[in-house]
């Protein structure tokens, strides 16, 4: 069996692991903290961003949020970095998604925003890597529990989608 098929077959286990984590005390505290940010903050919109499959998760999440009358937009991290960063204000809740937590555009965007906003922009990072740059730079981080991945995003895509949902 090739590695790609093996990782696809591991998806149910990784979904169970991720759900188990968010049913634990630590996981519940992380989710509650994000919900508290949105409900108590003075935000006028949520902007979700990422690259590649992380951006595809952003698009799906923004669509779901708008169905619940939450003002949400998905913007590719490269577009935000180079052309559209002016849409991000202190009243924006930014959800930055990167399975590795090291996507160049996402990290560079956060560096630039940190300089421009002096850390007043609230960032929720969603990543599979707890020790990543994204996890360190985010106001709060939500962790995927997909384990190690050697091929294209399979386990991380599905667990990221679950976490953002």
Feature-to-residue mapping (PLM):
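Cofactor-/ligand-binding subdomain signature composed of acidic, glycine-rich
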Residues: 1-41, 161-162
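Glycine-rich phosphate-binding loops that contact phosphosugars or nucleotide phosphates
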Residues: 40-165
């Amino acid at each position: 069996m090739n590695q790609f098929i093996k990782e696809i077959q591991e998806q149910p286990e990784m979904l169970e692991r991720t759900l188990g984590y968010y049913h634990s005390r630590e996981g519940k505290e992380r989710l509650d903290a994000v919900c508290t940010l949105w409900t108590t903050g003075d935000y006028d919109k949520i902007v979700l961003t990422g690259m590649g499959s992380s951006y595809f998760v952003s698009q799906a999440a923004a669509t779901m949020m708008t169905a619940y009358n939450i003002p949400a937009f998905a913007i590719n991290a490269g577009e935000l970095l180079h052309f559209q960063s002016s849409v991000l204000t202190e009243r924006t809740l930014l959800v930055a998604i990167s399975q590795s937590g090291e996507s160049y555009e996402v990290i560079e965007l956060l560096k630039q925003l940190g300089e421009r906003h002096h850390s007043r922009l609230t960032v929720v990072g969603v990543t599979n890597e707890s020790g990543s740059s994204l996890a360190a730079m985010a106001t709060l981080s939500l962790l995927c529990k997909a384990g190690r991945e050697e091929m294209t995003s399979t386990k991380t895509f599905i667990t990221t989608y679950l976490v953002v949902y």
